[in-house]
């Protein structure tokens, strides 16, 4: 049966995902940055209260995936922490300035991760040649690749995702970016073994007093009075589609 991974940005999100049938959680901070490394407090509390597998993301900042030596050193320390806390896997990705997988740094990541399953995230979609990148990641021992098929969303990139799947069984190709109940069946019919979804909504903050003339963000257009939450009904609907597909 296809596996359903849900991207979560808090304990509340993780609990909702677990209750509604998620098989695995990608744990992140900073949704507006596309996901950054969670804090120690979030890592430990989620590890203690969630029973399904959790793979934290290791990403020190938003933007591109070419990191300074200092940023990369911090990534290795975060990987060691995730390993010490007993997580079964992690999510990360590093590129060269030319858009190739940085194999030298991936070797260090794999060594630091040890027995943990490593997912190479959507840095893959920023690679110059996805097929060369997939071969390099297979050689590195990466467990899976999260990809939208190098398009804005996975529905647009489905043909490339299918080509990547045809390259072999490892790494597992996990489709993500815009995967929802209304298009999930297309991915299942295409033979995708794992799907990744945010299943999220923005809810209004409960704050009653709001200083509309002041922002805590460098982006003055950012809505600071909304909060990201996983929508339980969306997770349950997707899991139901997967179960029914398996029963055919």
Curated annotation (Swiss-Prot):
InterPro entries (UniProt xref): CutC-like (IPR005627), CutC-like_dom_sf (IPR036822)
GO molecular function, one term: copper ion binding
KW Cell division (keyword) present: no
GO cellular component terms given for this protein: cytoplasm
Xref: SUPFAM superfamilies: CutC-like
Compartments reported by the entry: Cytoplasm
Transmembrane segments: none
Oligomeric form and interacting partners: Homodimer.
Family (UniProt): Belongs to the CutC family.
Protein name: PF03932 family protein CutC
């Amino acid at each position: 049966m296809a596996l359903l991974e849900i991207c979560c940005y808090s304990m509340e999100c993780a609990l909702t995902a677990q209750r509604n049938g998620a098989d695995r959680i990608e744990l992140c901070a900073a949704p507006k940055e596309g996901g950054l490394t969670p804090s120690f407090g979030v890592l430990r509390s989620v590890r203690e209260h969630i029973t399904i597998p959790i793979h934290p993301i290791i990403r020190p900042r938003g933007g591109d995936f070419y990191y300074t030596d200092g940023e990369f050193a911090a990534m290795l320390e975060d990987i060691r922490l995730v390993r010490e806390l007993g997580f079964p896997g992690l999510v990360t990705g590093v590129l060269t300035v030319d858009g190739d997988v940085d194999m030298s740094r991936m070797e260090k990541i794999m060594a630091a991760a040890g027995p943990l399953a490593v997912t190479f995230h959507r840095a893959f979609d920023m690679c110059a040649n996805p097929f060369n990148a997939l071969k390099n990641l297979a050689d590195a021992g990466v467990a899976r690749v999260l990809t939208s098929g190098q398009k804005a969303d996975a529905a647009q990139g489905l043909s490339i995702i299918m080509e990547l799947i045809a390259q072999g069984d490892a790494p597992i190709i996990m489709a993500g970016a815009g995967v929802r109940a209304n298009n999930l069946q297309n991915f299942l019919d295409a033979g995708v073994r794992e799907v990744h979804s945010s299943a999220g909504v923005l809810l209004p903050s409960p704050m009653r007093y709001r200083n509309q003339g002041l922002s805590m963000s460098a982006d003055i257009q950012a809505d600071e009075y909304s909060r990201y939450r996983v929508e339980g009904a969306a997770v349950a609907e997707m899991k139901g589609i997967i179960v029914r597909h398996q029963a055919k």
